[in-house]
Structure formats: C-alpha cells, structure tokens
A protein has these predicted regions:
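N-terminal intrinsically disordered, cationic/polar leader segments
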Residues: 1-89, 96-137
Length: 137
C-alpha cells in the first residue's frame, strides 16, 4: 500500500495583466482553488484549478492555471487514504507556478496561501474553495 509520485504538469495557464493598475495600492486577492482526485486503474490523478478573476473589486491581474499530478498506486489500494497526501504533494508546485507567472509579468510575485489539506479535503474526492489572502500591494 503505497502512493508514489510520478510527475506534475501544468496543463494550462492563462495570465492577463490588468491595464492601468494603480501603483502602491492594496488589492484584496481571493483565488478560487479546486482540487479533483480520481483513480484510473493503477494511477491516482490529482488536478488543481486555480482561478482569479475580477469580481466587485479591481485586481492587478487575472489568471487560470490547471495543474495535474500523477501518482502510482497498487491496484488493491483504497485511495481514500491517499487523497490528502496527493494534494499536499501537488499544491506546492501549484503555488510556485502561480508565483512564477506573476514574477514573469514584472510585478511582485503572488503566493497562494498555505492550506491545511487535511482540514479542507479530508476524504473528499473533489473540493472547491475561495481562500482569502493577504492584501497585495
């Protein structure tokens, strides 16, 4: 009974810098983060989608990133015990990808918040949340 990390890939990333953003202004960033876990024979697929779009308040950029982590599991394994570990393994890569996207736009890198996957996911196979984050200035 083991979960083995195979790889991680960014399947899609879209980043748009908002024109005419005000310098030295605080922006309240509320990303929508979803995690979907599914099993295919001897694989566990962990897909994260992170979205940030304009809502009621202006923000300096919009993005959508889809990242997939692939794990190997034994055919007889009950993967419900692996869901938290899989999400905990992939999420740091997702955080780094988002930070790198913002850094390449020549703005301060945006770090997604830390998330306690055990609290959020538990044994669920699909979770979506909006995470309040510190203001970005």
């Amino acid at each position: 009974m083991a979960l083995r990390f195979i790889d991680y890939k960014v399947q899609n990333s879209v980043f748009t810098l908002t024109p005419d953003i005000a310098p030295n202004r605080n922006y309240k960033i509320m990303p929508k983060i979803s995690c979907n876990l599914r099993r295919t024979q001897e694989r566990l697929i962990c897909t994260f989608v992170v979205e940030l779009a304009h809502g009621d308040q202006p923000i300096p950029f919009e993005f959508k990133l889809t990242a997939v982590g692939t794990f190997s599991v034994d055919a007889a394994d009950d993967v419900s015990s692996f869901t938290v570990k899989a999400a905990e393994t992939v999420y740091p890569f997702v955080r780094q990808s988002v930070a790198q996207l913002t850094l390449m736009a020549n703005i301060p890198p945006y770090m997604l918040p830390m998330i306690d996957m055990a609290d959020v996911i538990g044994g669920a196979k699909k979770v979506t949340l909006s995470v309040p984050n510190a203001n970005l200035s």
